[in-house]
Amino acid sequence: MNYFSLYLKGLICFCLLFITMDSHALSIDKGYRQNKIKDLALIYQGGVHRIDWTSDQFLPYVVHQFADGHKDWLFDGFLFLEFTDGKGCGFATRYSDKNARKKEWLWLLDRLFEDGKALSALDRCIGTQIKEIGKPDFTHQIVLCLPEVLPGQKDWGEVDGEPMDFSRQEDQVKATRWYIDELMKRFKQAKYKHLKLSGFYWLAEDVDFTKDLSVPLSKYIHSMNKTFCWIPYWQAKGYNQWKELGFDIAYQQPNHFFKASIPDKRLEEACQSAATLNMGMELEFDERALFDAKDSFYNRLVAYIDHFERQQAFRTSAMAYYSGNHAVLDMYKSTNPKDHEVMDRLANLIVSRRGKQKKESHQTKVIAHRGFWNTPGSAQNSLAALVKADSIGCYGSEFDVWLTADDELMLNHDGWHDGYSLEKTSSDVLRTLKLSNGE
């Protein structure tokens, strides 16, 4: 073999290796983004137009009480954010005619760390629930927002005796780093028993005004072993460049809930976009989701849950939850069973996402009736009420067990709509189940 042939063969091998490595790198970034915080609740707090966020108001966000009376832990992460002080000053663009200054930033800090409210109240609420239902197998994570340093602002104030001019990038970064340091210092001083500071949130929902700031701030945040997250609105400028912008995770906003004119197809498109761009997903609803609300958007919330299940978002994606000012609290207080029904459904999905299994000593009891699946030759047992089935990793849920034509035992975990999500399961386990009708 001559020298040219050897060279050509080596070049081809190198190219194939490069392509293989590049394809592998792409495959790693395919699919929904995952995160140590599985379910992140957005808490709008600080402005005078918000509720105080006392321990009682946090209760339905910390634990959920199901229809059968049992409680379980709900959200494992909480994002505290605010756009305006409610008195005329804004912490982000487009929310107020007047930009917040250092004075308002300090006021917002005081509100966040106020005793008996916000972080303090959340910590106490968790402590109270630990006494009632036991310690969770996770630590509640906290994400804190960073106000947007608005370009051109010159009246913000001083850092280390130097006036800040936000027409200069170095001053924008310096002021934000000061705020990060204040958040870190106060959180440490508070000595919360049940909260851990996970990272920070970029308040701007696009990069129209501050695109050059996220990378240097990301480096500073990472130097303290904290994470940096972002939730851009639907197809916001820069949403598809979130990694290049320095964020550890970005959540896709479908922005479907808010307008009845937006078709449900948006939810499918948002899920597919997130999976393509390796983003997490945000589930959105507000007080209009209550069944008895005027011009209720209840069905739009149901559509989110339906589509997120079908698109496997609940199964594999990190999730953020926008619930308006306090829609979860409103659902909790509602006297309409439909509101509790949809929250039971959502809470059951959240609990199951943690992969938590109940260790129960009681014997499995199943109420069932014999039915017939629409596939010819396949017998079916429809399990109408599974009380306890810790041996197969299910708890308090309903599902069907199918014996297919080729004697394969299958579980259907989808009882909420006409679609079916099938999983193979252990024949040995299922044959140990005793049905109350004697089968």
Tell me what each language-model feature is:
Residues 140-150, 163-179, 197-205, 221-239:
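Aromatic-lined carbohydrate-recognition surfaces of secreted/lumenal glycan-active proteins
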Residues 179, 203, 213, 218, ...:
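Extracellular glycoside hydrolase catalytic/binding regions
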Residues 26-28, 351-439:
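Phosphate-group recognition and catalysis centered on beta-loop-alpha active-site segments
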Residues 79-86, 143-150, 186-208:
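Active-site groove signature of glycoside hydrolases
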Residues 235, 249-263, 267-357:
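Substrate-binding cleft of secreted/luminal carbohydrate-active enzymes
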